[in-house]
């Protein structure tokens, strides 16, 4: 009968393991003494028993959170310098209200081991988390961790805790800060509205963001690695994120970037013994905050169809003395880009009006700015910027189109879309979308130089298109935008200059290529919406999520 003992022992072991796991889950995430609800400002002793000060040679470097009796979770970038990996110089302080020294009842523990994700390269690239194994167990209550499928309430209030070195109010004292969780797309949208390329799309796969209350300074130096935690309905506090980095101490218009703990839960589960990964109620609804920021190049309706009416919320219809004359693209709250040749001999702003998106009304023009080097379409520089008489309010029916930076790729063979008229000379009701294939200057030059072509030189600042298929009737529209999609974001690739955009490959249409004119546009109106090309999605922690990693990754 000995063969029976194996299964019996396994079942008993599993029972003990399950009981231990359930006990850990009950114990984790229980806030200590203090007000019934967290209050903005200084904490009280023991309020957050898992709060850790990560120190090197006694000086506070980063914050962290106790997630098991021998494990502290913090940020990888705290250990980027070579000297930082000398573990005997590092320690973790638990239970202290002060950034320096030890509060009564605080405990300082040495660090026995450090674990970083293999994919970590730089905090801006993601995977910014680290595990510190303590030299001996501690009795402080740990924070709960989320399962991989955990959904946090975007737009709802969670809390960050840290010492916030830049505050003048009780410097060096542990503080509570209310943060609203912000999804990655919305966070990127907010940062892109700062119109600074080095801050473009900072939230990468495996990140989320947190925004402080209006007028309140967010996490700052020394708060890196600290927890952002949310209260679950069952009363447990769960770590939603790890403070990674911010611009200007996370002001309202520049949220703090967080490592998404749930996105790295599998990595944590494989390494942390004794941590409680809290199961979430399956009834938790999906939550979205997409409506809180209007992103350039975002299309909330069905995509374009050949020959169908335009779905573009950035479409501009230029009316000269009441007649449809040209197309264009809305690129900010008050700017439209179009072709310069539309205005030769008719440059009085009062003669023009602009229809936008799906809105029925029209806007007047305050100013017309033609590129100073423009002489004729075949000579290039066929671009103009129009300033509206009044700024528009962006929303579902009006959104700006993203402008590309000079290194934006417009590869041969890429699918694009243009606007055309269903009938020659027809008005607004005849506008339709036309699918096209992008052609670079070399391929386009060969076709224009071939028999039957017009022999026009194709300059480096141009891009060409060839219509895909045939529509029953179609005529290109001067100044109309050439748009293409990159992983869900739409960009202005070009503005129609000459040639018929409805023609096939024998006579490609020619467009002013927007990547070549970033300097000119920026010099006129820095408020336009430039955007980086979205990078390929990847599993958080994978090498693909960190494109600057060496190939050995």
Swiss-Prot record:
The keyword Protease applies. Its EC number is 3.4.21.-. Residues 1-23 form the signal peptide. GO terms for cellular component: extracellular region. InterPro entries: Peptidase_S1_PA, Peptidase_S1_PA_chymotrypsin, Peptidase_S1A, Trypsin_dom, TRYPSIN_HIS, TRYPSIN_SER. GO terms for molecular function: serine-type endopeptidase activity. Its main location: secreted. GO terms for biological process: proteolysis. Residues 27-46 are annotated as: Disordered. It is found in: Secreted. Disulfide bonds join 62-78, 158-230, 187-209, 220-249, 326-342, 444-464, 474-502. Keywords: Disulfide bond, Hydrolase, Protease, Repeat, Secreted, Serine protease, Signal. Coiled coil: none annotated. The keyword Hydrolase applies. The active site is at residues 77, 128, 224, 341, 382, 478. Residues 24-273, 294-526 form the Peptidase S1 domain. Belongs to the peptidase S1 family. In vitro can degrade the fibrinogen alpha chain of as well as pro-urokinase-type plasminogen activator. PANTHER family: SERINE PROTEASE 33, TRANSMEMBRANE PROTEASE SERINE. This is Serine protease 53.
């Amino acid at each position: 009968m000995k063969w029976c003992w194996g299964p019996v022992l396994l079942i008993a072991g599993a029972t003990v393991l399950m009981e231990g796991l359930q006990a850990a889950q009950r114990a984790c995430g229980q806030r200590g003494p203090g007000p019934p609800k967290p209050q903005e400002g200084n904490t009280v002793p023991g309020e957050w028993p898992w709060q850790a000060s990560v120190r090197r040679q006694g000086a506070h470097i980063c914050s962290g959170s106790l997630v098991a009796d021998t494990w502290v979770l913090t940020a990888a970038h705290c250990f980027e310098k070579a000297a930082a990996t000398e573990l005997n110089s590092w320690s973790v302080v638990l239970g202290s209200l002060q950034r320096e020294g030890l509060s009564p009842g605080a405990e300082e523990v040495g660090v026995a081991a450090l674990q970083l994700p293999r994919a970590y390269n730089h905090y801006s690239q993601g995977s910014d988390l680290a595990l510190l194994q303590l030299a001996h167990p501690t009795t402080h209550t740990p924070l709960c961790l989320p399962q991989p499928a955990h959904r946090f309430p975007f737009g709802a209030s969670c809390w960050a805790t840290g010492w916030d070195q830049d505050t003048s109010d009780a410097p060096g004292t542990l503080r509570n800060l209310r943060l609203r969780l912000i999804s990655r797309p919305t966070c990127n949208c907010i940062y892109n509205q700062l119109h600074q390329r080095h801050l473009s799309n900072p939230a990468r796969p495996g990140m989320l963001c947190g925004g402080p209350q209006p007028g309140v300074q967010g996490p700052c130096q020394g708060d890196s690695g600290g927890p952002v935690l949310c209260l679950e309905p069952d009363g447990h506090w769960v770590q939603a994120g790890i403070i990674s980095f911010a611009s200007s101490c996370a002001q309202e218009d520049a949220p703090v970037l967080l490592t998404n703990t749930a996105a790295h839960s599998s990595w944590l589960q494989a390494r942390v013994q004794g941590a409680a990964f809290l199961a979430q109620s399956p009834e938790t609804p999906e939550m979205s905050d997409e409506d809180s920021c209007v992103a350039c190049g975002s299309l909330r309706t069905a995509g374009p169809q050949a020959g169908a009416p335009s779905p573009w919320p950035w479409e501009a219809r230029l009316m000269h003395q009441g007649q449809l004359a040209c197309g264009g693209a809305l690129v900010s709250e008050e700017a439209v880009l179009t072709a310069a040749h539309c205005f030769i001999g008719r440059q009085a702003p009062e003669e023009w009006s602009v229809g936008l998106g799906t809105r029925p009304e029209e806007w007047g023009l305050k100013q017309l700015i033609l590129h100073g080097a423009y002489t004729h379409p075949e000579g290039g520089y066929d671009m103009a910027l129009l300033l509206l008489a009044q700024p528009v309010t962006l929303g579902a029916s009006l959104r700006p189109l993203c402008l590309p930076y000079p290194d934006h790729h417009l590869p041969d063979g890429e699918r694009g879309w243009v606007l055309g008229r269903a009938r020659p000379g027809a008005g607004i009701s005849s506008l339709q979308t036309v699918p096209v294939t992008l052609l670079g200057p070399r391929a386009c030059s060969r076709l224009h130089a071939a028999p039957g072509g017009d022999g026009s030189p194709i300059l480096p600042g141009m891009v060409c298109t060839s219509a895909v298929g045939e529509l029953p009737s179609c005529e290109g529209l001067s100044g109309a935008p050439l748009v293409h999609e990159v992983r869900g974001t739409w960009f202005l690739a070009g503005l129609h200059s000459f040639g018929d955009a409805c023609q096939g490959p024998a006579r490609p249409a020619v467009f002013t290529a927007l990547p070549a004119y970033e300097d000119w546009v920026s010099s006129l109106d820095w408020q336009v919406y430039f955007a980086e090309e979205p990078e390929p999605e990847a599993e958080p922690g994978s090498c693909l999520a960190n494109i600057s990693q060496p190939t050995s990754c």
